[in-house]
């Protein structure tokens, strides 16, 4: 690991938005290497408390006074230009670096950077691969967009040349990375507040492919038509995977009673080995194939790949079993794009249940608006839909779109759908209507998981 771009270990580095999952991971890597770290966030959280315990100075709220001792400031794409700490840094000529630039510079210190991109499945695949790499004893540094039990958080600092990270396409952040193995899980229309259209998104992924060196590897889902159209841009080794085609395929797929797949891994019509997943759905078969391809490209042993895949039981907020109450199961999932919701509901439909309640909180006004038609068609596997208000995240409500409008369209299609504006009202509705053997699935990237926790903790 090298921190040459920072120049001086005595420097004080300040993170604006330090409570974010990626920012906190970067801060933790630097704390491990004895840098002086501070950071600000709008709210205290278990993440900020953990960083404080590790030696970071944490400020709640954004104020210009927070950066008085900083030599370098790292900020996220979600931080507005009128943030008082950004303004103060510019006035004082303190160096500013966005999160993607910082992570990209950090990656320069590693030889085997594995960057996992795609519209869906990045966190799960990064986590699954992390299990494989740890079983193979390659001692990787890991930065993942969720909490992973095997590393007790979202970051692990290793001593080898292996660095495993997610590569997010939002605002073309992943184009600042240095992948030796670049992974594309899928390409779908998303982040249309930044990208003009799907072709614009595909163009960004095409540029990502060109970042991979000639002796490196592109691992890609070969049955995705959007990937097929850009894979020719690769000037490196290419490994494709899929169910019915690709260099590495899944054959003889069977699902257990909880929708977890087991299958044979096949190359050139020859069986390599079999694996049994402990995460549900077809989408996780594809995620596991990507992890298997990376393991094979990295010369990991079949035994370690199998054990790593089979030891993975998921990450927090990815089809996470929250608990059972009165024989009613509560599961939470981070799905916030129509494609993800369809995949999650498909897995839930295979899960043991009588009636399936889907409690959905749309994430951002821009996504709800630009993908509105797709949102009206992705809930068909739910027996009943409960909609919360849109989670704004980095956006402001312009009054153009609302959950009520989505609910109206779903009801027009003949689906049973109810809108609520308060979590307490959702909880009370579930208390009255969920019965023995039912399944409650909370879905969304905001704070809808709290509804499930409220229900479980009655």
From Swiss-Prot:
One Pfam family this sequence matches: Mur_ligase_C
Biological process per Gene Ontology, one example term: cell wall organization
Compartment list: Cytoplasm
Residues that bind ATP: 118-124
Keywords: ATP-binding, Cell cycle, Cell division, Cell shape, Cell wall biogenesis/degradation, Cytoplasm, Ligase, Nucleotide-binding, Peptidoglycan synthesis
Pathway membership, UniProt: Cell wall biogenesis; peptidoglycan biosynthesis
Class of the enzyme per the UniProt entry, highest EC level: ligase
EC number: 6.3.2.8
MF-aspect GO terms: ATP binding; UDP-N-acetylmuramate-L-alanine ligase activity
Keyword flag Coiled coil: no
Any one GO CC term of the record: cytoplasm
Catalytic activity: UDP-N-acetyl-alpha-D-muramate + L-alanine + ATP = UDP-N-acetyl-alpha-D-muramoyl-L-alanine + ADP + phosphate + H(+)
Function: Cell wall formation.
Sequence similarity: Belongs to the MurCDEF family.
Protein name according to UniProt: UDP-N-acetylmuramate--L-alanine ligase
Organism expressing this protein natively: Clostridium botulinum (strain Langeland / NCTC 10281 / Type F)
Gene that produces this protein: murC
